């Protein structure tokens, strides 16, 4: 009992210290630091916190012919996140100008080529100037490649974008479920 309590305390200290750093993570989370199984996790999967930051640039939107309220958008970003380390994001989506809702698909690819694949639903909200918006996107993990094969879970990307300047940056927070023995 004492050994189990000591091991649990050590894991808690390691997680608190790791999550308390002021900058973004610099390497993927080690599976050795993960010891608990979530009751919300599918079929014996392990829930792993997923946090990070990204920044990138959007391509100019492609508007559909009137009277359609839709345009297509493409974003390429890079960042740093737990599990992935340094990554690139490739995100294509379609936005309704009437509702400011966007739907699309994204791939977050780690430096070694392993990727998390997601379906994305987002909502833009005006943020000051007529061209500035805060975008909140829910990424639902639909699978992956390499070590992320069979992954599930979801995370939220909250980012700022100004269409007068295609630069965007933001944060990532959620949980990824790893099939037993993965990550």
Residue ranges and their predicted role:
Residues 15-18:
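C-terminal motif of bacterial Sec signal peptides marking the signal peptidase cleavage site
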Residues 23-28, 32-183:
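Beta-strand-enriched cores of mature, soluble protein domains
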Residues 1-9:
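Bacterial N-terminal signal peptides that target proteins for export
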């Amino acid at each position: 009992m004492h050994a189990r309590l000591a091991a649990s305390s050590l894991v808690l200290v390691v997680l608190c210290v790791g999550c308390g750093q002021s900058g973004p993570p610099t390497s993927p989370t080690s599976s050795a630091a993960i010891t608990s199984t979530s009751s919300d996790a599918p079929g014996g999967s392990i829930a792993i916190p997923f946090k990070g930051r990204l920044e990138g640039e959007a391509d100019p939107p492609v508007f559909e012919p009137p009277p359609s309220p839709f345009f297509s958008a493409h974003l390429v970003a890079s960042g740093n996140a737990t599990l992935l380390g340094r990554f690139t994001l490739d995100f294509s989506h379609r936005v309704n100008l009437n509702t400011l809702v966007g739907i699309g698909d994204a791939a977050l690819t780690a430096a070694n080529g392993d990727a998390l694949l997601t379906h994305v639903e987002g909502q833009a909200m005006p943020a000051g100037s007529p061209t500035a918006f805060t975008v909140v996107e829910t990424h639902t993990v639909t699978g992956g490649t390499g070590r992320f094969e069979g992954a599930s879970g979801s995370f939220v990307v909250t980012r700022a974008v100004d269409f007068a300047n295609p630069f965007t940056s933001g944060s990532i927070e959620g949980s990824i479920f790893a099939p037993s023995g993965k990550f």
